[in-house]
Regions:
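Flexible, surface-exposed loop regions and adjacent strand-edge segments
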Residues: 11, 20-29, 72-81, 127-137, ...
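Transmembrane beta-barrel architecture of outer-membrane proteins
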Residues: 1, 35-45, 90-96, 110, ...
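Outer-membrane beta-barrel domain signature, strongest for Gram-negative TonB-dependent receptors
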Residues: 1-57, 63-65, 214
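Outer-membrane beta-barrel proteins
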Residues: 1, 19, 25-41, 83-90, ...
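Signature of Gram-negative outer-membrane beta-barrel scaffolds
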Residues: 57, 62-162
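Residue-level signature of outer-membrane beta-barrel architecture
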Residues: 38, 46-49, 99-103, 149, ...
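Outer-envelope beta-barrel architecture signal
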Residues: 2-4, 44, 52-56, 107-111, ...
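Membrane-embedded beta-barrel scaffold of Gram-negative outer-membrane proteins
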Residues: 3-22, 160, 165-176, 191-218
Length: 218
């Protein structure tokens, strides 16, 4: 048999900040940031429920996110203000699978293998205005797009002792996608790169005092 699970989520954020940028008793610079963020996500997976040595799981994940950010900087001593508008929508999908084989070669030893594929597309529509009593002047503008994809594997070994306790070892690849910063001053700070890591974990778990104390070493 099998079971199907679904998880749907929606997030909404409305943030307003006012910051005294000159940090002095005088009114010289004052920054205002207004940001609205909306995100919708859906995850669906199906996994085996039939008793046996082999267990499997397949899943898919998708999301859409929209961020609208406006940063206004008032220059009181110069009688003008700057206004930066950042429109940063993004969407992504992921597909994953995991298989586990129990009692591999010997009773109590299990092997788990997993793999995941991620794809994400993000864009940034940026407008920069200088505002005075005489009106508004556009100083800069761009519309950029970025695409990212990555495959991340996982492998784990676990041995359950006949009495109590277990040993385990896990190797996984971690991934964090790149994208656009929600605000920036320099051109080189407009985007950030993806990050990857390899993670290794070795450990043991064992109960003591008739299961009243559990110890874990890793």
């Amino acid at each position: 048999g099998y079971s199907i699970n679904s998880r749907t989520a929606f997030q909404y954020l409305s943030d307003h900040q006012g910051i005294d940028q000159d940090f002095s008793p005088r009114s010289i610079y004052f920054a205002r940031q207004d940001m609205k963020q909306k995100m919708f996500s859906e995850e669906l997976n199906i996994k085996s429920t039939t008793p046996g040595r082999y267990k499997w799981l397949f899943g898919a994940f998708g999301f859409w996110q929209g961020i609208d950010n406006t940063v206004t900087l008032d220059y009181f001593t110069k009688d003008y203000a700057t206004r930066k508008l950042y429109d940063t929508p993004a969407y992504g999908v992921a597909f994953y699978h995991q298989s586990t084989i129990d009692d591999l070669l010997t009773r109590g030893l299990s092997l788990t293998f997993g793999i995941r594929y991620d794809y994400e597309h993000t864009s940034n529509d940026f407008l920069f205005y200088k505002e005075t009593d005489g009106g508004s002047e556009q100083m800069d503008a761009f519309d950029s797009r970025l695409k990212f994809s990555q495959v991340t594997p996982k492998i784990a070994l676990q041995y359950m002792f006949p009495s109590t306790g277990m040993l385990y070892a896990t190797v996984t690849k971690g991934y964090k996608t790149g994208g656009f910063n929600t605000s920036f001053d320099r051109e080189e700070d407009r985007t950030f790169r993806p990050e990857t890591s390899w993670n290794y974990e070795f450990g043991a778990k064992h109960p003591f005092l008739d299961n009243r104390l559990n110890a874990e070493f890793c």
